Each structure stands twice: as structure tokens, then as C-alpha cells.
Swiss-Prot record:
Keywords of the record: Cell membrane, Disulfide bond, G-protein coupled receptor, Glycoprotein, Membrane, Receptor, Signal, Transducer, Transmembrane, Transmembrane helix
Transmembrane regions: 147-169, 182-202, 220-242, 260-280, 297-320, 341-359, 368-394
Organism annotation: Cavia porcellus (Guinea pig)
One Gene Ontology CC term in the entry: axon
Family the UniProt entry places it in: Belongs to the G-protein coupled receptor 2 family.
Name of the molecule in the record: Calcitonin receptor
GO biological process entries: adenylate cyclase-activating G protein-coupled receptor signaling pathway; cell surface receptor signaling pathway; positive regulation of cytosolic calcium ion concentration
Amino acid sequence: MRFTFTRQFLAFFILISNPASILPRSENLTFPTFEPEPYLYSVGRKKLVDAQYRCYDRMQQLPPYEGEGPYCNRTWDGWMCWDDTPAGVLSVQLCPDYFPDFDPTEKVTKYCDESGVWFKHPENNRTWSNYTLCNAFTPEKLQNAYVLYYLAIVGHSMSIITLVVSLGIFVYFRSLGCQRVTLHKNMFLTYILNSMIIIIHLVEVVPNGELVRKDPVSCKILHFFHQYMMACNYFWMLCEGIYLHTLIVVSVFNEAKHLRWYYLLGWGFPLVPTTIHAITRALYFNDNCWISVDTHLLYIIHGPVMVALVVNFFFLLNIVRVLVTKMRETHEAESYMYLKAVKATMILVPLLGIQFVVFPWRPSNKVLGKIYDYFMHSLIHFQGFFVATIYCFCNNEVQTTLKRQWAQFKIQWNQRWGTRPSNRSAAARAAAAAAEAGGDNIPVYICHQEPRNDPPNNQGEEGAEMIVLNIIEKESSA
């Protein structure tokens, strides 16, 4: 499968040959024509030759025109094939995708006049097809590309900052340590590395036309690690889904050795499709810096990723099913029950990446397509920010741990530097609050609400289901 959002980034890649300002100006609305990269240019020429061959073969195979009245003969205009057309009819086709400066979503037209002759341009009196709408670099499209470009930079920058802070919290506070948090830390790390590589690519490779023309090995290595970290990111989402689903159907894993399978799936398996893609890309579609998305070889990576997302989608449905079932058993009000189910679903969606399954295709309508672009790009680039916020900063146990640490810090500060009597009483209250917050107890629900000394494997299936129920309910209320 080819993700629809990757095609949108093609607009960014195209900008590499035009590093100067290309937004519309009142004194100059003429934009330079994109100079294709050598490999992509040869691919486009091959597409053009193949289309011409198919056109002439088609013209020979089609039966003679059987309509009444004058008509325009079937023809090849140098770019596209046109069938026999009745007089007075405007033929319309989608623009070809031979070169990057062609927008295949736009339309090309050719008019057959009333006398049955293809329209001729008045300036040169030659047969003319209208390809003007095929230009991929109109001011509006370029401005939209710039907006998406800076949206990507801002989103991934904010994701890196929040994820680094979240990862630091999980690493520093050992009381938060458990298998589920270990999975969180690994997934956070993939978000951080993936966002860093994307920013490097957008800042150093995309605007540098000279670098892309030279086609150094380093930019292809960067692309390899970008694809690898992207795959790792989605497979660690799958690990999170497997772990949560396991809490429902079997008892909770307690031995650390089980984590090795998650490490193998999250870090090891993505190497397989990424390596295969790199080898086949070098052999069969070796474009400059591997920036083109017009190749089916991307299915090698995106196929397994899509499978992981679909599996997580079914995990989500089953988790919500269990949540609704348990709330029915507790005889909660129906409206409140469904409200909690919706909240739990919204909490799990950014963790499991389900939005890419729910909205897999871009609408063909221009307005809806633009809305889809901004919506999906916001989810993609800010997903790390959302995950860090929901699963760390809004987590009750993390907040309790931070409050306890802050209270202890104030106590130590006051003891070191001395305080007035009123401040001493405040420090005493802070100490009492810190002790009440949990002391040395293991976190309550971030680690499945397991008491430290109780064997987790004795809870059975129902106990495991209630653990997940408590996790989701408390995180959704955070």
C-alpha cells in the first residue's frame, strides 16, 4: 500500500530545484519550469514512449467511427491519446504523470469544433490540447506546499521536545518502571529518531538541489534510516496493541524475558522489509536520493506497516468491546457508558495509529482534499506530541510522582536554606502530601494496578480484563 500522505510530500521534494522564493509576487507571476532529475527524466521519457506505443496500437484496434455527422479523428497529440470525438464536444482526460511538474489530479482538454476539426491555437494555427491546468506549480499549490512544509517542521520539533521530556521522566523516576512503560519508552524513542531524521531531510536535503543532483550515497543512507525508523515506529505501535490485547485474553506477563519478543518485533523485523526495499530500489528504481514516491517498490515497506495497522485496528475494536461489556455488567447509565467508550477509543487511537486505517484515501474533491491534507498532516507530524501528552503528561501516576518529587525538593530546599515559621508549616504539609501520594509504593495503574507482592499471573482472564479497564478508564479521565 502507498500512504496517501507520502504523495503530498512530493511537492516538498519538487521544490529542491527552486530554492529561491517562489511564492507569487505582484510584479512576477511567472514560475520557473521544474528541471527533472536525470533518472526521473528518463523514467518520464520511458512512460511517454510506452503511452505513444499503446496509443497507436489502440487506434489500430478500435473499429471505425460509427456515429452520425462530422467528427474529429483519433489522434496522438504528442502527450496523450484521443479517440474519435463528435463535433462540438470537449474531450477531457486526467493529466499524465510523466514528470514531477505534472499534476495527475488535474484535467487536460481537447476541443473538436463544429466542423469536425481539432481546435487550433490562434497564435500558430496548430492543433492544440489544453495542458495549462496540468502545471503542478501554480501559486496556490506552492503556497499550500509551504504551509504543509512548515507544519511538518513545527510538528516534529514539538514532538521531539515533548517526547524527550517524557522519556526523561520515565527513565529518571524508576518507580514508574514496568513492562508497559518499557514499551512506551521504546515507542517514544522511535518517534524521536524518526522526527529527527525527517527534520534533517526537510532542512538539509529538500532545499538543496545541488546535493540531490550530485546524488551522494549519504542521502540514500539517510533515506534508508528514515524508512527503517518509520517502520519501527509503526511496529512498536503494534507491540503496544499486542500488549494491551494480551491483558484481555491471557494473564499479564511478569517475567522480563517476554520483552525480548517485543524487541525483536519492534526493532528487528523492520530491518527485513527496509533492507529488501533498499536493494530493489538500487537495482530497479535508483532515482536521485530516492526521493520519488512513484514506485511500487514502496509496497515492500508500506505493506507490512499497513498489516500492522489493520491488526491494531482489530485490537482496538476488541478492547472497546471488553470495555463496553464490563460497563454493562456494572449497570452504568447507557449514555455514560458510551461516553466512556468513546473517550477510551480516542485515547487509544494515537497510540495504535488507527487514524491511518480509518482515513486511508484522500478525497478527490479539492476542498475536501485540502481539509484531508491538513487534518492528516497534523496527525502525522504532531502524533509524537499527542502521544507524549496523553501517555505521560496527562497520566495520573506521572503527575502524582512529579508532585511528590516537587514537594520533596521544596522540603530539602527549605531545610538547606532555612524558612520562616509559616514556610515550615507549609513544608510540613507538603511532606505529608508527599507521603500520602504513595511513598515508595509502585505506581498504581500505569503498571496495571498490580500490588508489588501479589503474583500477577493468578488474576485470571477476568482480572486481566479489569486491569485493562482500569488503565483505559483512568487514562481517559486524566
